[in-house]
């Protein structure tokens, strides 16, 4: 009898698990399929709420530079996915918290920026969200908020009494953003130590004023996010939710969004659509499938099918580059970048969308040394590096090797006031007379 009971009970548990799985909300299901989902404070309850109605969720972004780089793109793609499934994203641009600086993952105190510079950065960063997110449908259009609106107006004594009383030093010392710095005997300012409380307060403000039920962030933000859900529970006796995405690890071991040329910026005035396209085109073979799920809108099942059927990894890289560039810069820019690459690499021609180096016509009349051309435009950092590259036959002008370090650039090198400068196999520039 006991064996029969055990058999029935086990099968019942399996059926319940299957039912729960099929009931999972489509937004959260796709989060999992794309690899966006790392941790959640209460996944079942959040799924249940999302099945019943649309929600608002937010992600916070520091405004320490004029542009976000591609390391922030996964978070923006999650906001875009929220819209796809009928939910409303809130973009928190941290005009207040950027005055402090998030210590997470940092070895030292960040450079403190003036409010005027932060405001300029916010204005510049906002352009990217308006390009990637859909602003045309009122129900799911992004809400932009700046936490300076409430953080800069706080009364210190009142804040300590009403908010600070809900946090213990004991618990705050256990969070990685604090613990790692202290374990390494690196200084952590009182200002930075307060960052996690301010982030929790942000969530409370958005919960109270915007009915925001969900905060999303990278896995390094888990402690800060949980602080927010705890504060909301203590202040309102209601439940809010936190969700993290995994930190992106590259097969090469390098950091996402950083290359030998510098950061891969999202703003067009800091990185051309062609260079952006090339970044994705040069993805490590081992990362292509993951990046197709992370950074394109192609359905996950379709990606699996494409990856199974298409054996040419370079065609998959072009697909990735086209889709990622389309999302940020538009369809025309993606097509133009692909055609430029084709003209440059396959046809031996000069692509129209290559990064440009402009030289004054008077310099050409006098003649400019090849060494100066390369070093002044920071293609390589020193003339000694340029000399070594020339000795190794690393430079070409219009596909002809430059083998003389004393070469002088003059009008004979130009065709219709331009020429193609190549360094190695993957770096190409359009040198133009102005």
Could you describe each region identified by the protein language model?
Residues 4, 9-15, 20:
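Short, positively charged and aromatic/hydrophobic N-terminal segments
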Residues 17-219, 229, 236-241, 254, ...:
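NTP-dependent nucleotidyl-transfer catalytic core
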Residues 232-434:
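Conserved nucleotide- and phosphate/pyrophosphate-binding catalytic cores
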Residues 151, 223, 286:
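Short alpha-helical
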Residues 212, 219-222, 372, 378-379:
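Acidic/histidine-rich
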Residues 223-224, 394:
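Well-ordered secondary-structure scaffolds
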Residues 156, 190-203, 225-228, 273-276, ...:
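Short runs of predominantly hydrophobic/aromatic residues within well-ordered alpha helices
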């Amino acid at each position: 009898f006991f064996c029969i009971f055990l058999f029935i009970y086990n099968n019942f548990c399996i059926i319940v698990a299957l039912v729960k799985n099929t009931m999972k909300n489509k937004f959260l299901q796709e989060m999992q399929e794309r690899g966006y989902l790392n941790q959640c404070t209460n996944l079942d309850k959040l799924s249940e709420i999302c099945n019943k109605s649309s929600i608002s969720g937010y992600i916070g972004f520091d405004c320490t530079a004029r542009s976000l780089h591609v390391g922030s793109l996964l978070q923006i793609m999650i906001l875009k996915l929220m819209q796809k499934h009928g939910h409303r994203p809130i973009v928190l641009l941290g005009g207040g918290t950027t005055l402090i600086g998030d210590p997470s993952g940092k070895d030292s105190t960040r450079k403190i920026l003036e409010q005027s510079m932060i405001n300029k950065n916010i204005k510049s960063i906002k352009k990217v969200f308006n390009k990637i997110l859909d602003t045309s449908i009122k129900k799911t259009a992004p809400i932009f908020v700046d936490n300076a609106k409430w953080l800069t107006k706080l009364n210190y004594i009142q804040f300590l009494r009403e908010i600070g009383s809900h946090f213990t030093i004991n618990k705050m010392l256990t969070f990685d953003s604090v613990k790692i710095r202290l374990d390494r005997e690196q200084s952590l300012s009182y200002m930075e130590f307060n960052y996690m409380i301010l982030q929790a307060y942000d969530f409370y403000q958005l919960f109270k004023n915007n009915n925001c039920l969900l905060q999303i962030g990278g896995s390094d933000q888990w402690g800060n996010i949980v602080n927010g859900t705890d504060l909301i529970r203590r202040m309102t006796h209601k439940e809010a939710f936190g969700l993290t995405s995994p930190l992106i690890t590259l097969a090469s071991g390098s950091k996402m969004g950083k290359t030998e040329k510098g950061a891969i910026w999202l703003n067009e005035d800091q990185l051309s659509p062609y260079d952006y396209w090339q970044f994705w085109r040069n993805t490590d073979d081992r990362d292509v499938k993951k990046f197709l799920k992370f950074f394109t809108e192609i359905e996950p099942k379709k990606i699996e099918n494409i990856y199974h059927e298409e054996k040419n990894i370079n065609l998959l890289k072009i697909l990735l580059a086209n889709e990622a560039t389309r999302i940020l810069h538009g369809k025309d820019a993606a097509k133009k970048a692909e055609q430029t690459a084709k003209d440059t690499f396959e046809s031996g021609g000069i692509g129209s969308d290559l990064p440009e180096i402009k030289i004054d016509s008077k310099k050409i009349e006098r003649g400019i040394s090849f060494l100066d051309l390369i070093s002044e435009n920071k293609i390589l950092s020193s003339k000694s590096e340029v000399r070594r590259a020339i000795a190794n036959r690393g430079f070409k002008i219009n596909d002809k090797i430059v083998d003389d370090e004393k070469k002088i650039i003059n009008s004979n090198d130009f065709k219709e006031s331009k020429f193609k400068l190549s360094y190695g196999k993957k770096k190409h520039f359009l040198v133009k007379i102005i």
